């Protein structure tokens, strides 16, 4: 481990942490503070690591209308994506949209996304449709959500904790669906909520309805949401976003039943669907000319059934609580694209990605003297399939005897078994300060195998031959963790932690296929892939250093090996003999280090005349480099590392709760991705040459948002905001780091983020 990076970022994080509280002073002891409620973190709820919660109120206040905008003010979390019509590493039929979340420089499938513990399907790599031009990009993303359906979003930054059944190298984003108990309490047995919003960035209208009723013994909830919108506007001066219109519907029904004094049952059924029609041009890889005029009809849906039992036995001394959850999830993605290609004629392509998953999680908790012992088991079984159809005619029957395109990957079946044990031991020091030791371990076994290989058979490769190429893959991992925490004061804690993490290969990497039927070259997965692993170190501070200040700060260093990428060989491939093969391989190693800080200041705690005034400040910085196993390669900066970002905000909330207003400024440095020739390396014994590609530099930017609300009555609130108030023209780095500097000016302008936009909403709550 290279400790200079941890030392450097630790100094930055701790320096900022110690400096900020000096701007605040506590009130004198003789001052009265009768109306203030102080929320203290009970020792049993303190956890190490950077854990962020975005509440339903945060989503409303910050204009979080979709998968991406809920993260707009997070310093090291973002939602990269692509737009319809982009050409770099994209086919005409790959859909636009968000691909997933990026946390601390790792993105897409290296970040877990789940809803109530049920993981969402993986993002589908584009190499299956465009070959090596699509390395590192995705054709089907992970956006199966409607932000109105959730009470909160829990985020773990960095390697996931041992208690998280959905382990991942980069972190996790967990959406918690609405429940009746969130809105009901003793004395309130009914709830009605209605929300109506308009967002000018994509001219979308939203209507949401939440109804709940019941008591402590039996309650239920019904949530409905409808959205209608168009394409997200860009801010280019020469080309507008290509036209599209979309609609989505979501419904959730749930009930809670206190079946006995010991058992609480919760059941939830939720369904989401979205349809979209798009018209766009597809440009070539370098963004210099249009290759086809396309029309796409897209559909996706997700159905989930969850049953959860919380058992608190009174007659079993070694169990305080046992929580057991069962889930069933089905997802379907369907894209039909009519393509008018300039050289290949007119044809239609239909792509699908369908999954079916069963999930089981159980967690036991026991408090014994100064220990909190947690243990759990989990299991997941899933099937996926990728039906594919094209009417395209082969342009060269000798090279492509079965046409230019075939099924992108084999259908597969996968199951995973896991368990964890964690002991949280507290030691009291001087009757006030606590020291905590938290050892833990997670074990994971995963097995994946291909199915229905006969569906991939072509003229020169039958199902039996494919069975030799695509076989089962399995692995077992032991992932230890160790954390130390110390209470600087009862509400402010320092921590140091180590975690081992792993990311097992997915079906896209194991069984992907491109041109496997051709006599030219082939790009395929590898059934013998090893698991990606990491060692993660983090030092941080979190809590309330002084009255009126909430602060979370961390510095981290992560080291990775066995990153999966593609390597070129000339070798025999089943069914066609010797030729060029690009095959998935555990090719790269990498490291990432950085620091982040988030803080909030209640200025009214120190200056009574400023009661209602608050401020926030957040900053995130990270750096990361990777190196392949190729001769002559060197460490170069990872293109998934976002440039430094800071958020500064000032807010006023009327003490009489009549209105509030906030101004928030977001600043991000510019950055230019560093090109590499790893994807075109001949692997013939000569050193890896430098790349001649030159990427477009993404300029730094600063944008200002102005938001506010008015409580018209106790139950009716009008809220809204103006975003990018100064109409700044800018590009999002993580979504556009592979644009070429030589691309057409119009093409580059197509990728600009929205200019000045506004949102307006009405909330009714009874």
Where are these regions (language model features)?
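Periplasmic N-terminal accessory/gating domains of Gram-negative outer-membrane beta-barrel systems
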Residues: 50-102, 107-109, 117-142, 154-160
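C-terminal beta-signal and adjacent terminal beta-strands/loops
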Residues: 59, 121-124, 502, 561-562, ...
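Outer-membrane beta-barrel domain signature, strongest for Gram-negative TonB-dependent receptors
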Residues: 91, 245-384, 545-552
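Transmembrane beta-barrel wall of Gram-negative outer-membrane proteins
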Residues: 198-228, 238-279, 297-312, 424-429, ...
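Signature of Gram-negative outer-membrane beta-barrel scaffolds
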Residues: 372-489, 515-517
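Gram-negative outer-membrane beta-barrel transporters
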Residues: 27, 370, 427-429, 435, ...
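Outer-membrane beta-barrel signature, preferentially recognizing the C-terminal barrel domain
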Residues: 290-315, 353, 408, 412-414, ...
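A beta-strand signature from Gram-negative outer-membrane beta-barrel systems
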Residues: 139-193, 765
